[in-house]
């Protein structure tokens, strides 16, 4: 997570509370999904076509939460390892593994210091896990270390614009900037954790500095008829129709 030990403890506490209120009650529903969907507005993988054929691929999911994405990858024939700092979320993941009789390794670890072998993975993936919650240069360097030559990194996080427009205390993103961009990495929310939302240029420098090649940046908008997410007060569907709510990055490690 973030490089500050105090922030790491605070973030772990935040996710203990979020897990109790949101991710644990919702875990089973996500484990039962028949297809990967991306982001707050559940954009189907079939629409974006990012993953391709994952059969036989070794996958490290960093900041896995309840590991529903790893579960889908396992059903599709991949060999995932799911990593998270929150033992509460991993306990929810373990319960779902037993419930659905689908098991793969669950590891409690910081995404910036993963106890896994160098160059062991074809794909490193993170959906609202490492990207907003860890210091960017630390976790991206670790992702690059884990990847085999030719392996891919895919990660999803809040858009920079959404992070700029979310009110200080509570409420959905507005149509006005609420803070300077230089204050976004790190940014500590009142009553919440510490996140990182660097600008696109900084993300590119971080990825290239770790030895990766940037392949794509998808700025996500909701599909037609999408509803505002019931649990996460970040952006409304109406806001996201006008401005990108999420950034989905794709990079690879040169062969």
Labelled PLM ranges:
Residues 1-32:
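N-terminal, positively charged/glycine-rich alpha-helical extensions of SAM-dependent methyltransferases
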Residues 29-57:
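Conserved alpha-helix/loop element of class I SAM-dependent methyltransferases that forms part
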Residues 58-113:
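Class I SAM-dependent methyltransferase SAM/SAH-binding core
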Residues 112-123:
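A short acidic, Gly/Pro-enriched loop at the edge of an enzyme's catalytic core
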Residues 123-137:
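A short SAM/SAH-binding and catalytic strip from SAM-dependent methyltransferases
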Residues 137-152:
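A short glycine-rich, Lys/Arg-flanked "PGG" loop and its adjoining helix->strand segment in the class I
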Residues 152-185:
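Conserved class I S-adenosyl-L-methionine
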Residues 193-217:
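Short alpha-helix
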